[in-house]
Amino acid sequence: MRPVFPLILSAVLFLSCFFGARQTEASASKRAIDANQIVNRMSLDEKLGQMLMPDFRNWQKEGESSPQALTKMNDEVASLVKKYQFGGIILFAENVKTTKQTVQLTDDYQKASPKIPLMLSIDQEGGIVTRLGEGTNFPGNMALGAARSRINAYQTGSIIGKELSALGINTDFSPVVDINNNPDNPVIGVRSFSSNRELTSRLGLYTMKGLQRQDIASALKHFPGHGDTDVDSHYGLPLVSHGQERLREVELYPFQKAIDAGADMVMTAHVQFPAFDDTTYKSKLDGSDILVPATLSKKVMTGLLRQEMGFNGVIVTDALNMKAIADHFGQEEAVVMAVKAGVDIALMPASVTSLKEEQKFARVIQALKEAVKNGDIPEQQINNSVERIISLKIKRGMYPARNSDSTKEKIAKAKKIVGSKQHLKAEKKLAEKAVTVLKNEQHTLPFKPKKGSRILIVAPYEEQTASIEQTIHDLIKRKKIKPVSLSKMNFASQVFKTEHEKQVKEADYIITGSYVVKNDPVVNDGVIDDTISDSSKWATVFPRAVMKAALQHNKPFVLMSLRNPYDAANFEEAKALIAVYGFKGYANGRYLQPNIPAGVMAIFGQAKPKGTLPVDIPSVTKPGNTLYPLGYGLNIKTGRPL
């Protein structure tokens, strides 16, 4: 019997951390200066500046031939921050390459905004959407869904938050609480916790609380839900056709739970929801009538989110340069429409990459001023938005700034925190726990190679095969497996040929990674067509050819699903099949994500995978049937369901 006291103690410590965040916020608000008084002293231009959050991902200084990644503050960018008094800046991977450089940059940003500190934001979701060059990336939300642990979710949020705080970043556009109930979704997928509303709500809430524990402003996204779409709003305008009853029961459910628990921010979705707003607008792209997306809808932002769901925090748009908005609405017009709808912060309202383009900011401000002047936007609405922004800055310790350390001291502290051994250990442990065994017939796993055995590594891209290779080298170095011979095969856009079959035939073991964004194999008469010559189908055709060759030559073969686990349905004939929920590999001397190494550890019996599916995997040969249901996963040793 397991000792009870350690379990009780860990639970008490966890819950004390969870609820302690509320106490910290409450005490901070008591000693804070009054946000309303600050707003009353601001000019209209200053207030409107607070409602804009541009990016300076790349910058072209005078005399340079093209924009370059902005990793170091310069006088030109600093002058724009001071002039327009922006409420915040969003940072991208181009801006946060090393710990030292990032701390220096964020410090310089704040020095350029002496009146009211900036919200310095980032998309550090964990998993496939991460920006920090030297941070702890974690296996991602769907891996958390497979692990099914509130403590792991809280720990993930807390560690990410701790690293961001050390770097001077105070706002994280995370967690994603979209319910991924559409297997054809091209943009959410493993960024979602689950297709189950309860699991998504629970893990989203605890991730949010982990971030807030570190005084990071957390933004739920993408409201009212981007999970049941088959179009990526970066490239098109998606539509969700469900009725209000279904949307309230499913899509809105995780948002409501997190709002009730004290959400700081909500990020909008550039998605059409005719059940909530069927207003049409003439597209600037082709003159057609289109439904107004949620980001620009007053019925959704004010009527639904504010009034019906009771959200009193900060609403921020998704990036306004995404094609769902940029293709159909004018730049200034989109910002005005978003603010009219009830949004507080316009994210990336204009793309400015040099001083020559500065007037784009001026035009956005002027358009907003004119909307206030002519009564389209009441000034009291502007005041309310800015008061919410300032209140959040106070609540999360941005204003007044708490950290009085020198830049040198901040860098020294950050280097001890960001990507620390302790954090990487937690990341590794979670990734290994999340690995989900879907098949292990004839005890194919774990592989037990003899000295000199030949292992063939197959994956679409070089960094993925490199990750598998490096993990095997690490196992050999630690004497967990005997020295083996490795060969690699990268198959992106490739056709399976005789030389590939020869490599399979010569191997003693074969590890194959499948990487699919949208799973759409060609099926004829209930069978996957492996003869298809369409070059766009390589992601399915090639790994299936490897599998079939391995079966023909009686070679131990394991298929590792690297991204959305729906592609597992393409390999029913395989005897061993696992899902790891993350595809990033190994480059520049570091693992970009812990998922592939965790899968390799499981394959060689050096980890104990405990994951169960957070989504249903539909059959591709029998439409309407579920091949592997939500909650399915096998014990790798016994082959029995967990």
Curated annotation (Swiss-Prot):
The reaction(s) this protein catalyses = Hydrolysis of terminal non-reducing N-acetyl-D-hexosamine residues in N-acetyl-beta-D-hexosaminides
What does UniProt give as GO cellular component? cytosol; extracellular region; plasma membrane
- Induction and repression of expression: Up-regulated during the late phase of exponential growth and during stationary phase.
User: What is the topology of this protein in the membrane according to its UniProt annotation?
Assistant: Lipid-anchor
Q: How does activity depend on pH?
A: Optimum pH is 5.8-6.2.
Positions where lipid (S-diacylglycerol cysteine) attaches: C17
Protein's job:
Plays a role in peptidoglycan recycling by cleaving the terminal beta-1,4-linked N-acetylglucosamine (GlcNAc) from peptide-linked peptidoglycan fragments, giving rise to free GlcNAc, anhydro-N-acetylmuramic acid and anhydro-N-acetylmuramic acid-linked peptides. Cleaves muropeptides, but not peptidoglycan.
> What is the protein's name according to its record?
Beta-hexosaminidase
